[in-house]
Amino acid sequence: MARTDLFRFLARCARTAAHCERTGMPESEAVEASRESIADRTGRRRLLQGAAGAAALAAFGAHAGKSQAQGPADVAVVGAGFAGLYAATVLAGKKLTAQVYEAGSRSGGRVASLRGVFPGQTVERGAELIDTTHSTVRQLSRQFGLTLENYEKQPGEEFFYFSGRHWSEAEVVAEYRAFVGAMNDDLQRLSGGPTADSHNAFDRELDLMPLSTYLDSRGAGPLLRRVMDTAYTIEFGREIDRQSSLALLFFAQANKRAHFAPFGNFSDERFHIVEGNDAIAGGLEGQLARAVAFGHRLVRVSRTADGRIKLAFDVGGRTVETVHAAAILTLPAPMMREIDFDASVALPAHSRTAIDGLDYGTNSKMMIGFTGRPWFERLGCNGGSYSDLPNHQNTWETAPSTAAFGVRGVITDYSGGNRGARLDPAKLQTEAGAFLQDLETVWPGTTALASRDSQGRVLAHLENWVRNPLFKGAYTNNQPGYFTGLEGHYAKPAGERLFFAGEHTDSFYNYQGFMEGALLSGARAADQAWRALR
């Protein structure tokens, strides 16, 4: 499971390298065999994951259809993203009424679909890719009658451009194969998934070691070093000197992260909702017994004398206070640091540590429209490209099922780290031009077909979540020290009848950073609130 194509590619490299080690098969043959095996697994996985999703929804008490209001709201849910909406849904299934508050003017949070900009196609400003193992997302898409398109079924190959030239997948696998051998001693000494509450001294040592230092100290080859740099920078949104080496090691050791198993049942499939991923948010919002209270920015949390939770909101410049039996806060991690937690809350040390310490990546997305699909029509590429160029890191084709050869197509330019942070939506044409110039190096002869208006302006949209005042970041980055200092803390109750949810509160070993993680964290927090109030 991964947010980006390049991370999926590394997973495939890991699996292929392991197969070469076991069998002695040449890298080029193993690469071809790996590609052929992907299609064979699709139907069986889809059936199994659909059943798993239904079971998860039933276990958390989720329901279909509009819930009925039952007097005053028992639980406040702050944030109308996936976590908050699903928490309210699960609470309704447990016969608890929730009031959802949202600082912005819409539901969905960082799941935000863009319609009407690219003719005939819906693209994603934020979360886009849905994995086979994202059972809850897929079950909800079925519940709301939405259509999943499979990006992996698109024809063509991926392009890799590093150190001034194109490379084959087999060449990357060869260097990865050598590097995996160098990691074996470290993998043997790591514990079974370290957390802030349970880890050994070696876990701590490698957790504090930046990924950049680890790659250099373990002798990563020059090509692999550049590929890893790009892959992890865009996957977690920070430069690799700001990431823990354990993020790599638990990627490589499949049994440490059961849903992300490059040597076993890792999924190479990725899906998108044709109608737009935020249609799930619309479906969940439509089921709520109480309308979402938009324009409510949480500024302070305190307790009343009888132990209830008092929330103070800024609503158009005036303060509005509400009191609830319990509260679930689902704000993005950077926004949690702006809340004033009164001493009466008695916030536990683990909660304060999580709030103060968790880091977010600086990812951006820029979508570019084309008059056709020249990456395939001219070069045989499926839309996936990766490089170490200054204005290009990773691309994929967005909404391919609604594209048309010779007519229309959309490429997503996905970035992280320093480039992701600096991209400026106010300078859209400048940013698009710089990207297209580097893309021409990766895909020669294709960028002339970028869609332009009569004045030569490129059809494009740029989203930088760091610059959005309601989010101030993309999603969780596992910085040095995260695993042994923070992992597991955010999911714990924040004192009596106060709980946290959101992708950042889910475990790294589950679905942290994904829509699935947001949904499951909402279900977990709702269950915690229900148990506290029953």
PLM feature spans:
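Conserved flavin/dinucleotide-binding core of flavoenzymes
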Residues: 5, 12-22, 308, 314, ...
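N-terminal Rossmann-like FAD-binding beta1-loop-alpha1 element of flavoenzymes
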Residues: 74-99
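Dinucleotide-binding Rossmann-like beta1-alpha1 core, especially the glycine-rich loop
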Residues: 118-189
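N-terminal secretory signal peptides
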Residues: 1-42
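Glycine-rich FAD pyrophosphate-binding loop
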Residues: 92-114
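N-terminal export signals
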Residues: 39-41, 46-67
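Active-site/ligand-binding neighborhood in enzyme catalytic cores
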Residues: 30, 195-300, 307, 315, ...
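Mid-domain catalytic core of redox enzymes
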Residues: 294-414, 442
